[in-house]
């Protein structure tokens, strides 16, 4: 399993990219879908895929390949529960579960050493979550080697959407709805 690396919507239209920090931060005003390469360095994309704002996830042209869709918040919870998280924990926010974050992570060479990697369940699910970091609404890049940020397809409000975070120093999974849609996160697809 790997993070999404598409540069076009399903209909063939190019997904905009190459935005300066200021231009990236202005995408919130137009709700324009876009993607970025961590630190504008294409070699990162080979390993971590691209970082997409949530507007690209929500675009009616479809960002997932034919026969696939971006995982919803509910599908993330189903996955977490299949890995042993209780339903009540899955429905809560913040860090939840026990070792589900470690199960979802993969590739010890890429992660900064911490509780995520040191847990015996590390990498056992096949999900292979990699620490690709994120692009903030200001356009700056953060946390490669330390975190995996994933958008779900589930909206929370005009400004926010549901997401997941794997962090090098936690073996559980972070769920929240307070990152702005303008942030650039990794994406995972589920077969229709």
Where are these regions (language model features)?
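Conserved positions within compact, well-structured domain cores
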Residues: 1-192
